[in-house]
Amino acid sequence: MDEYIDFRPLKYTEHKTSMTKYTKKSSEKLSGGKSLKKVSICYTDPDATDSSSDEDEEDFLFPRRRVKRFVNEITVEPSCNNVVTGVSMKDRKRLSSSSDETQSPASSRQRPNNKVSVSGQIKKFRGVRQRPWGKWAAEIRDPEQRRRIWLGTFETAEEAAVVYDNAAIRLRGPDALTNFSIPPQEEEEEEEPEPVIEEKPVIMTTPTPTTSSSESTEEDLQHLSSPTSVLNHRSEEIQQVQQPFKSAKPEPGVSNAPWWHTGFNTGLGESDDSFPLDTPFLDNYFNESPPEMSIFDQPMDQIFCENDDIFNDMLFLGGETMNIEDELTSSSIKDMGSTFSDFDDSLISDLLVA
């Protein structure tokens, strides 16, 4: 028995590689043959290593035995005439975004962007997504703040789409992409209202006596109202203003002359343009009637009566009366004079000493 039996532990690994190949369609395959093929290529390497660390195991007494199996699978499929179906999801999104940018904003605004799924039952709206519990949430991205704005949760997808459309128009203007087109009622409301024609008020005029035609025309121009005023009380005020004015004449008993004319000269007219010195205001002063006889017009003999002692009757000094003739000869007056002379001498002496 010369056979060698290897009792080393065995480690088996398998490496699989898959790829897809596309071929042109043939008449046989179109008639009813299978169009899908799968080719597998297998190879086993008994002395293969998994990593560089396997060489270090040779130093051990019983190193492990490595067996590696390689499997290559090739799937052959017929090619498709429609190129879009063979494009990956990333390329498909890229193509859809580029097509949206090429469209004009006006056409995209009128066309509702409703997306129908493969099943054809659920509609997808822009900015609307469904929650796991069944409600619909709406959100929009603010281009200025560069963040998403939460719009709320709604029962139906249409309600959420309408809220998104309003927010998009508010943030991006009337040319923003919306889910629904603007109804014609709102467009009619946006039209300018018709201008209101204002009626001109009828002015009632009454004939007034005037001295000349030019004065009457000037008064009419002053009291005309503006064409835009339509108030009734304005016309009443105009009628009151246009009534004839009574000329204000001064009463006969009241004079409008200045204060220096009053009582002196009334024949110069009613104007106040004169100066005080223009009128002879001293005429009436000298033409007045002579006054009554005064004391100064009497002769001196009549003024002084027979009693010459009129000033010598009483002299009030300290509450006592005295006779002037007696007092002049009395010694008290002499004593008073001596006291004044002594006072003068003492005052002069004090001034000299100082």
Swiss-Prot record:
Cytoplasm is among the record's keywords: yes
GO molecular function: DNA binding; DNA-binding transcription factor activity
CDD domains linked to this entry: AP2 (cd00018)
Residue stretches of biased makeup (Polar residues): 96-120
Domain of life from the UniProt record: Eukaryota
Region entry Disordered, spans: 85-120, 180-220
Keywords for the protein's UniProt record, in alphabetical order: Activator, Cytokinin signaling pathway, Cytoplasm, DNA-binding, Ethylene signaling pathway, Nucleus, Transcription, Transcription regulation
One BP annotation, GO: cotyledon development
Keyword DNA-binding: yes
Composition-biased stretches (Acidic residues): 185-196
Listed GO CC annotations: cytoplasm; nucleus
Major location (coarse): cytoplasm
Classification via InterPro entries: AP2/ERF_dom, AP2/ERF_dom_sf, AP2/ERF_ERF_subfamily, DNA-bd_dom_sf
PROSITE patterns: AP2_ERF
DNA-binding region(s), residue ranges: 124-181
Composition-biased stretches (Low complexity): 205-215
Subcellular location: Cytoplasm; Nucleus
Pfam families: AP2 (PF00847)
Summary of the function given for this chain in its UniProt record: Component of the cytokinin signaling pathway involved in cotyledons, leaves, and embryos development. Probably acts as a transcriptional activator. Binds to the GCC-box pathogenesis-related promoter element. May be involved in the regulation of gene expression by stress factors and by components of stress signal transduction pathways.
Family of this protein: Belongs to the AP2/ERF transcription factor family. ERF subfamily.
Protein name, entry field: Ethylene-responsive transcription factor CRF3
Organism listed in the record: Arabidopsis thaliana (Mouse-ear cress)
Gene: CRF3
